[in-house]
């Protein structure tokens, strides 16, 4: 169907609507995509602008017009065609995909009967309302593949989400973000992605649910001894004293913070559990009344100095500071790229009152517009806590819904060329709910997509062009913050305290006992959930308020979640600049990071 940009311009001039010349091509594409004539498209556009009180056509207005008018009109036509053809008004996601594949097979069969001089034959639609036309559009449009009827007969778009007025608002900024275009090079730039492990990263499933208490005890003891050895060397401590040995002079003890009961830790219930080498795993109560400042949580490995005159109670007078790991040193090839744009977003990708994936589709549109070099997507993609999932109201198996969601993201961003990194979550209802969590598996990737799509474990350390990213979808801020106790003479930021704990404890999840939502396999935890280095950028999504902070030279980002209940949430974007010849005070290659958290 040929569309004339000149005729579109004439129609717009008739109604006196101002516009940018660059928008005519976009308007022509919409005419082809939604099978509209020039005058019909302009008439609907004028009606939309008039009702919205707009006198000038902009990119944002055109995007809103496509979303609020054209897509809804197309969805209604799809339902009407489904009813007229004698089928149920809703199709699940499997049946839609089968129809698309069947159509492609028929077109392939028709083309096999043509001569090379002729073009491939296409089936002709008798009217624009036939289901075939809608399937053709659905094959190209991510919004149609993830239409409300794909998952649940009762699915309707969230009214609060669609009526939001603050989309695109920048809510927090870090670094020199002023003047940046916030657009990447997509597939045109060279991107090096490498998963880093100590000794190796988690790449597949493992046998869980079989660990003995002695095995857990050995892991925790090893953590105490290894971290204690590092702190001993750093603080130049001669020797540790056993916990239960009485002494009249000050003693220095190594151990792990615990609680003397099953309740929440408080200043009166703190105990110190010693290591095997010095204290044989003994425990001793701790009196914190002499400490002016402290921040403690269960599972924290600490070195304390104080008095233990009876061998039954330690009166702590000093708490030694923890020390983070050194930074990652990239190779010459990894550090060759000078600038990289990264987008990070965390699920859920649906609002709590609807199973429609409108927020995810809006994110796909942003990826195609900005063309970031890398886009990191954290689960959950199909949230186990969603009401319709809990009540089993979906018409398709969880695995099928997830695969279609994944397929839509991959195909929908193909034109941008952006590299995609998928991080699972323990809230992904279809995936293995064990920590550390193995990567997703998806066998339907094409050869081209395999070059730009990567599935990683939870948690994961990922080098992007020599910049080390720490990635985790677990809400560390909430889990540790809920168990922490602290005392400070001045103002203190809880987020900064928790982040310092994570970096100095050198673990992606240092809390013990873990949160009730966590099913931890400690044998694999010891292998795959430790920080191999201090990351340059640490992504820590949380239900708590978004932020960007510099902790020990590590840029820590909480991008928030893409949805918050029934309303839209936030996502993050980072702009990284390498300065190969510059070195910072920590002996690492110069790195400049600008970051923003933006409303979807």
Swiss-Prot record:
GO molecular function, one term: DNA binding
Superkingdom, natural source: Eukaryota
Main location: nucleus
Residues bearing the modification Phosphothreonine: 127, 130
Keyword hit for Phosphoprotein: yes
Post-translational changes noted in the entry: Phosphorylated in a cell cycle-dependent manner, in G2/M phase.
Key words of the record: DNA replication, Nucleus, Phosphoprotein
Location of the region described as Disordered in the Swiss-Prot/TrEMBL record: 107-165
Residue(s) carrying Phosphoserine: 126, 141, 147, 152, 154
Subcellular location: Nucleus
GO BP annotations listed: DNA replication; DNA replication initiation; DNA replication, synthesis of primer; protein import into nucleus
CC annotations in GO: alpha DNA polymerase:primase complex; ciliary basal body; cytosol; nucleoplasm; nucleus
Residue ranges with Low complexity bias: 139-159
Pfam families assigned to the protein according to its UniProt record, in alphabetical order: DNA_pol_E_B, DPOA2_OB, Pol_alpha_B_N
Subunit comment: Component of the alpha DNA polymerase complex (also known as the alpha DNA polymerase-primase complex) consisting of four subunits: the catalytic subunit POLA1, the regulatory subunit POLA2, and the primase complex subunits PRIM1 and PRIM2 respectively. Within the complex, POLA1 directly interacts with PRIM2.
Family to which the UniProt record says this protein belongs: Belongs to the DNA polymerase alpha subunit B family.
Protein role: Accessory subunit of the DNA polymerase alpha complex (also known as the alpha DNA polymerase-primase complex) which plays an essential role in the initiation of DNA synthesis. During the S phase of the cell cycle, the DNA polymerase alpha complex (composed of a catalytic subunit POLA1, an accessory subunit POLA2 and two primase subunits, the catalytic subunit PRIM1 and the regulatory subunit PRIM2) is recruited to DNA at the replicative forks via direct interactions with MCM10 and WDHD1.
Protein name as annotated: DNA polymerase alpha subunit B
Species this chain originates from: Mus musculus (Mouse)
Lineage: Eukaryota, Metazoa, Chordata, Craniata, Vertebrata
Gene it is expressed from: Pola2
């Amino acid at each position: 169907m040929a569309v004339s940009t000149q005729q579109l311009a004439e129609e717009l001039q008739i109604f006196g609507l101002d516009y940018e010349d660059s928008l005519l091509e976009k308007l022509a594409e919409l005419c082809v995509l939604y099978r509209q004539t020039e005058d019909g498209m302009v008439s609907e556009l004028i009606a939309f602008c008039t009702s919205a009180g707009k006198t000038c056509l902009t990119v944002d207005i055109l995007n809103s017009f496509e979303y609020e008018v054209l897509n809804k009109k197309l969805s209604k036509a799809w339902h009407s065609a489904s009813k007229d053809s004698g089928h149920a008004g809703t199709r699940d996601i499997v049946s839609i995909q089968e129809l698309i594949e069947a159509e492609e097979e028929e077109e392939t069969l028709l083309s096999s009967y043509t001569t090379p001089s002729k073009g491939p034959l296409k089936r002709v639609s008798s009217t624009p309302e036939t289901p075939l036309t809608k399937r053709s559009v659905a094959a190209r449009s991510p919004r149609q593949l993830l239409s409300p009827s794909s998952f649940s007969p009762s699915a309707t778009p969230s009214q609060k989400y669609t009526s939001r007025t603050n989309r695109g608002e920048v809510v927090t900024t870090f670094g020199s973000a002023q003047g940046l275009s916030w657009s990447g090079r997509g597939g045109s730039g060279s991107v090096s992605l490498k998963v880093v492990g100590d000794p190796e990263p988690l790449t597949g499933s493992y046998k869980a649910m079989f660990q003995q208490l002695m095995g857990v005890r050995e892991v925790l003891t090893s953590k105490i001894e290894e971290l204690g050895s590092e702190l001993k060397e750093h603080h130049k401590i001669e020797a540790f004293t056993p916990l239960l040995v009485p002494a009249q002079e000050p003693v220095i003890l190594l151990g792990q913070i615990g609680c003397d009961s099953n309740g929440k830790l408080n200043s009166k219930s703190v105990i110190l559990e010693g290591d095997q080498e010095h204290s044989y795993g003994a425990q001793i109560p701790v009196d914190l009344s002499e400490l002016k400042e402290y921040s403690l949580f269960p599972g924290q490995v600490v070195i304390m100095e104080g008095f233990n005159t009876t061998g039954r109670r330690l009166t702590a007078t000093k708490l030694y500071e923890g020390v983070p790991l050194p930074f990652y040193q990239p190779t010459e090839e990894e550090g060759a790229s000078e600038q990289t744009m990264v987008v990070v977003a965390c699920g859920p990708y649906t609002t709590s009152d609807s199973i429609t994936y409108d927020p995810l589709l809006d994110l796909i549109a942003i990826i195609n517009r900005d063309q970031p070099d890398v886009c990191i997507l954290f689960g959950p993609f199909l949230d186990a806590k969603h009401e319709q999932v809990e009540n089993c109201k979906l018409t398709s198996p969880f695995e099928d819904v997830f695969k279609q969601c994944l397929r839509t993201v991959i195909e929908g961003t193909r034109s941008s060329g952006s590299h995609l990194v998928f991080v699972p979550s323990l809230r992904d209802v279809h995936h293995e709910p064990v920590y550390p969590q193995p990567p997703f598996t998806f066998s339907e990737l094409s050869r081209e997509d395999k070059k730009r799509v990567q599935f990683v474990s939870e948690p994961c350390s990922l080098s992007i062009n020599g910049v080390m990213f720490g990635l985790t979808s677990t809400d560390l801020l909430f889990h540790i913050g809920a168990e922490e106790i602290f005392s400070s003479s001045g103002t203190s930021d809880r987020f900064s305290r928790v982040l310092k704990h994570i970096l100095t404890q050198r673990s992606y999840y240092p809390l013990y006992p873990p949160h009730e939502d966590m099913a931890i396999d400690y044998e694999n935890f010891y292998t795959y959930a430790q920080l191999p280095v201090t990351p340059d950028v640490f992504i820590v999504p949380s239900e708590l308020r978004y932020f960007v902070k510099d902790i020990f030279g590590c840029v820590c980002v909480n991008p928030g979640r893409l949805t918050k209940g029934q309303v839209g949430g936030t996502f993050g974007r980072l702009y990284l600049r390498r300065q190969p010849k510059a070195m910072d005070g920590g002996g690492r290659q110069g790195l400049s990071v600008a970051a923003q958290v933006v409303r979807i």
